[in-house]
Amino acid sequence: MDVALEDNHIALLQHRAKNSGNTVLFKLPILRGSEPPQEWNHITVAEFAAEVDRVAIFVMTELKARGIPPRSAVTVLYSGSRYQDLIYAIALARASYIPQMCPHILTHPGVIFALMEKAGSKIILYDPSLEPATTDCPYPKMALNPIETIDSSSTINSDSALPTIEDLSSGHADVCFFYLTSGSTSGSPKVVPLTQKFVSTYYKTQFGIWLDGRRFDTQNAFLSRGSICAVAPIIQYFGCLYTGSCIVQPSKMRFSTEELLTLVNVCGLNRMTTFGTWLAPHIQAAKKDPAALKLLQEMRTVSYGGVPISIADDDWCFQNGIPLMDMYATTECGTLMVSAPGKPARFMQPVPGISYRFDPFTDTTTGADNPASTQLLKLILLADSPQIPQPQLLSEDGNFHTGDLFEKQLDGSYLFRGRGDDWIKSEDSRFIDTKAIEEKINDVCSDLVKGCIVVGHLRPSPALFIEAYHDSISTISEDGLKELVLRRLEDFNARQLKHERITDKRLIFIVDEGNLPRTV
C-alpha cells in the first residue's frame, strides 16, 4: 500500500476491503427484548466498506443539495453508541466532509451552536430524538434516518460518484475529525481537531499499546469502548481495521458477568477494554466464582482507562494473574502512560515514542510547593512529540500541559495522583468542574448560602453540600431550601453537560452553620 495513502483512514479502509475483505471487523448483538443476547451478527471489512460507500453517496447528495461544499465541517449530534453512528461518521469522511462529533449529552442549543461556530461547521446532522436541541438553529439541519431506510438508487445520478481515494489523500496537516473534550471549560467543551497525521499515528503506532506487543494465531477480539463521540472508540476502530482485529459489541456497556461469559464463549472475546467502574463488578464476581476468575485470567489483556479501580482490586488481580493494563490518555493527545510490567496496573510508565517532561507541581493558589513528603509532578507533552495537539490547544511555551499529577516511585514508575485543579470525574470518566458549580451557587444563592462544596468523584452525578445561613433555614424548610437552590441553578444547568448537573434535591445536603470544612 502506498505510504501516502496509508496515512488516510479512508484509503486504509478501501485497501483492507480489497485485500482482506473477509476479515470480520464487527460482531453486533442480536437483541430480543430485555434478555441478554445469545447471537451476534458478523460484519466483514468488505461489508462495512460497502455500507460506508452506500451511505456516503446518500449524505454527499443531500449535503450538495443543501449547498454544503466538500471539505466542510459537518456536526453530527447523536449518542454515538450505535453501529449506524460509526457508519455515518466514516461515510461523511468518505464523501470528503469533516465530522464534528457532538455527543447527545450536550442538550443546550446555544452551546451546540457555539461549538459548531468554533469548528467552522456548515450544517448539523442529528438523531431525530434530539430535535429539541436544534431549536432555532442558525445553521441548516438534517435528521439522520436509520441507514436501512436509505435507498441509494434514488440518489444516484451523474453527480453522485464518490471522490477517488487519491482526491481524499490530503496532506498530513489537514483536519479529518473534530472532537470535544469530556468536560466543560468556561461553560463549554474544547474543540479538538484531529489531523490526518494525528489519526494515522494512532493506528500505526499507538494501537500497538493495546496489543501489548504479543502475537497470537487467532484474531484479537476487543470489547467495544462505547460511543464514537469519544476518542478512544474511534482509535479502537482504526486500530482494529489496521491490525485485522475485530470489535465485539455487548448489549450495553454496563453488562453482567453472565453476558461476559457469553461474549467469550460465543464471540471469542479475548481483550477487554472498558472503564474501571464497569470492570469492577466483574472483578467482584471473579472473587466468588472460579469460572469468572478463569475467564479474566485467560484474557489477552484486561485494559481500562479514564476511571481507576480500587487499590485492593488492583492488587488482587495482580496476585491472581489477571492481565490488567491501566491506560492514561487525553482527548487531545491519545495514550500517554501505560502500566509498567511486573507490577500492579496502577504503576505506569510513559509510552514509547513520546517526548515528555515531569515538572514539580506548585499550588498556584498559594504559590507554595507541595509537601516534599509527597512530590507531585505535572505531566507535560513536549512540542516535538508525534502526538502534540494543534497550536490552539497548547500553552504559551508550545507544549501541552495535561493538568494531571503523578508521583514518581523508586523504581521509576509513576502513580496517577489526580488533577492539579478542581475537577473530578463522573463514573464514566467525564470531567466535572466543581469549582465552576460552587462559584455559580455562591453567586445566585448568596443570600441563602454561606458556603458550599461539590463532591462525587467517580459517581453518576455530583452532590452538593450547603452551609446555609441560620436565617435561611429558620424561615424555610430544608426541602424548600433545596428546591429554591435548584430553581436558581436552572439556567446554569441548562448549559452544562448532563453529567455535570445537580438537578435532584436528594443530592443536596444541608449542614449546620460552621460545619462545612471549607468554611471553618
From Swiss-Prot:
Signals that turn on the gene: Expression is highly induced during artificial growth in symbiosis with Populus, which is close to its natural condition.
Motif (FACS) on chain: 397-447
GO molecular function list: ATP binding; medium-chain fatty acid-CoA ligase activity; metal ion binding
One Pfam short name: AMP-binding
Binding-site positions, ATP: 180-191
Keywords tagged on the record: ATP-binding, Ligase, Magnesium, Metal-binding, Nucleotide-binding
Single biological process term from Gene Ontology: fatty acid metabolic process
Enzyme Commission designation: 6.2.-.-
Entry cofactors: Mg(2+)
Enzyme superclass (EC): ligase
Pathway of action: Secondary metabolite biosynthesis
Role, per record: AMP-binding domain-containing enzyme; part of the gene cluster that mediates the biosynthesis of the psychoactive metabolites ibotenic acid and muscimol. The first committed step is glutamate hydroxylation by the 2-oxoglutarate-dependent dioxygenase iboH, and the last step is decarboxylation of ibotenic acid to muscimol by the decarboxylase iboD. The order of the intermediate reactions is somewhat ambiguous. IboA likely activates the carboxylic acid at position 5 to introduce an amide bond, and the flavin monooxygenase iboF generates the N-O bond.
Family label: Belongs to the ATP-dependent AMP-binding enzyme family.
PANTHER family recorded: ACYL-COA SYNTHETASE (PTHR43201), ACYL-COA SYNTHETASE FAMILY MEMBER 3 (PTHR43201:SF8)
Record remark on domains: The FACS motif is required for catalytic activity and substrate specificity.
Protein known as: AMP-binding domain-containing enzyme iboA
Organism of this sequence: Amanita muscaria (strain Koide BX008)
Gene: iboA
